[in-house]
């Protein structure tokens, strides 16, 4: 069952992508009974849906979109042994005491340990220079603190400079025998605008040095503005979802979506049509293949996502699953775009 507010364009697009997943699976012989309910923000709307007799027999429910519906829907799912896939909200505590919940949009702090591990494995020979933002980015304090600890424990050198440090100071921090990573302590666009000019000069003046910029998921929303710089600065960022118009799977999906619906997906990150497809395909394929044994076989679910990857981990013995999948996206100096998948 899908429970979504269809007065929200994003949810309509999610549903459209989901239908494409259902169609793909039906073509391979999978039988699916799909129930779709328009669930607006009133609690009476949710209650009337949950009162329907067929709801108790669902194998999986996708939704809700509204924060206030999560608790009652999660309680219903738990009572009736139904998997609940929450694709949108990341600010949800229900997953910690409900074994039936799958949280797709992971709280950032859960991803940090994955990012640190991938970074130190991928770049054991790194020299990290943190560029301290003039304005503290509260969202990144925990990330930077954990990163410093992790790098320290792996013997990777870390230095902190002000974001407005002159090129000479940046140059003095370089190690010629290492991969030099500049990591700002803020993920916002203003910080990028401040640091890119100095780093660009540094790279041009020191062509022999191995210099990279490393950052955050939100950078994909600014890619259009900084594409040239991202390539020149050999940039990486981490994210649990990523797509671009150059990847074959994305091109195919976008063309099919256009053909089905005679429109483009909205320009936002993540793209909701792709999110609908990826979540629908993963869980419906998994249930058709493994049925009630799905949870035991999650690691065997080897699918190439269009945008959102999945790597589910139970949060504790009595809780549900969070998605700990992380990609690194790399803009190389050769103008290549590479999605690094670590699994």
Language model features: what each stretch is:
Residues 1-343:
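Extracytosolic ligand-binding ectodomains
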């Amino acid at each position: 069952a899908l429970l979504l507010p269809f007065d929200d364009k994003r949810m309509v697009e999610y549903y459209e992508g989901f239908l494409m997943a259902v169609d793909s699976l039906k073509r391979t012989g999978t039988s699916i009974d799909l129930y779709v309910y328009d669930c607006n923000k009133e609690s009476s709307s949710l209650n009337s849906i949950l009162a329907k007799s067929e709801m108790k027999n669902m194998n999986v429910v996708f939704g809700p979109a509204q924060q206030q519906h999560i608790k009652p829907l999660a309680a219903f799912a738990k009572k009736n042994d139904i998997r609940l896939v929450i694709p949108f909200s990341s600010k949800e505590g229900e997953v910690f005491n409900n074994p039936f919940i799958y949280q797709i949009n992971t709280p950032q702090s859960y991803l940090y340990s994955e990012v640190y591990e991938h970074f130190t494995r991928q770049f054991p020979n790194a020299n990290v220079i943190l560029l301290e933002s003039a304005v503290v980015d509260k969202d990144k304090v925990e990330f930077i603190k954990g990163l410093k600890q992790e790098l320290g424990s792996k013997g990777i050198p870390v230095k902190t400079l002000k974001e407005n440090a002159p090129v000479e100071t940046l140059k003095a921090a370089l190690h010629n025998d290492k991969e030099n990573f500049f990591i700002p302590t803020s993920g916002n666009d203003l910080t990028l605008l401040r640091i890119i000019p100095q780093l660009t000069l540094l790279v041009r003046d020191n062509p022999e040095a191995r210099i990279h910029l490393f950052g955050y998921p939100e950078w994909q929303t600014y890619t259009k503005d900084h594409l040239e710089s991202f390539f020149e600065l050999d940039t990486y960022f981490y994210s649990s979802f990523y797509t671009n118009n150059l990847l074959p799977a994305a091109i195919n999906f976008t063309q099919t979506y256009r053909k089905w619906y005679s429109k483009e997906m909205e320009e936002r990150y993540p793209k909701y049509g792709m999110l609908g497809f990826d979540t629908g395909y993963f869980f419906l394929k998994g249930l058709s293949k493994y049925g009630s044994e799905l949870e035991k076989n999650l690691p065997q679910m080897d699918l190439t996502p269009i945008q959102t990857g999945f790597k589910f981990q139970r949060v504790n013995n009595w809780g549900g699953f969070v998605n700990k999948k992380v990609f690194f996206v790399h803009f190389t100096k050769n103008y290549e775009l590479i999605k690094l998948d670590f699994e």
